[in-house]
Regions:
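Small/aliphatic-rich secondary-structure junction motif
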Residues: 1-57, 132-135, 144-183
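Short, contiguous strand/loop micro-motifs
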Residues: 9-11, 61-65, 87, 113-114
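Gly/Ser-rich helix-loop-strand patches that form or flank binding pockets
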Residues: 20-29, 99-145
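A short acidic, glycine-rich active-site loop
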Residues: 56-72
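Structural beta-alpha unit
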Residues: 1, 25, 29, 41, ...
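Short beta->alpha connector loops
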Residues: 13-14, 93-97, 117-118, 159-160
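A structural preference for short, hydrophobic beta-strand core positions in alpha/beta folds
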Residues: 36, 88-91, 139
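Residues on a specific face of well-ordered alpha-helices
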Residues: 75, 124-128, 167
């Protein structure tokens, strides 16, 4: 058992380098194909003094800004990924959670930052992603560049979901210094 395809989600409002570095490290460790992914959605309503309205010109400006940022993220991803790692890029101007959930069907592991989940138009909803993707999700701190699984703690509940989560995480447990289980 191994991860053959890893998706790394680049949040539109976060620095991309740390999460890309984690993705590269995991792809090299498992010999996996790395997919860089980014998405953001234009909010359909714009707040004005008269309330929430549809404003086509403002929405187009926001879409242009999103497309520009997606191009910047792609450039960083392509610059950072070494030629020894096979990779590809995917982006969309749509819901980041929905896009990542759909793209996850072609991956064995999803790597994403914890991000700012308050803006569903610009950040992934971790809860919805975890429940809807059907794939293991590794959530990293925003500034984390390396995976250090020295100690693994297993909180166990004898359910199908818990057994699946433990099975999905087994690859990370090959080399921890200690493995603990709460009593």
């Amino acid at each position: 058992m191994s991860y053959k395809s890893i998706i790394v989600n680049l949040a539109i409002d976060e620095a991309p380098a740390p999460i890309v570095q984690v993705g590269i490290e995991l792809a090299e460790r498992f010999g996996a194909h790395l997919v860089g992914l980014a998405a953001a959605e234009v909010p359909p309503l714009v707040p004005t003094g008269e309330g929430m309205v549809y404003e086509g010109e403002i929405m187009q400006i926001q879409r242009t800004e999103i497309e520009k940022r997606l191009a910047e993220l792609r450039a960083v991803f392509e610059r950072m990924v070494p030629v020894s790692v096979t990779s590809e890029w995917a982006q969309s101007v749509c819901s980041p959670t929905r896009f990542l959930s759909v793209m996850a069907r072609a991956a064995d592991l999803i790597v994403t930052g914890c991000g700012d989940g308050d803006n569903v138009f610009r950040a992934v909803d971790i809860g919805s992603l975890t429940l809807g993707a059907g794939r293991p999700v590794l959530v990293t701190a925003g500034n984390m560049e390396h995976i250090r699984a020295k100690t693994v703690l297993v909180a166990w509940k004898d359910t199908r979901e818990a057994r699946r989560a433990v099975a999905d995480a087994l690859l990370f447990w090959k080399r921890p210094a200690t493995l603990s289980s709460p009593r």
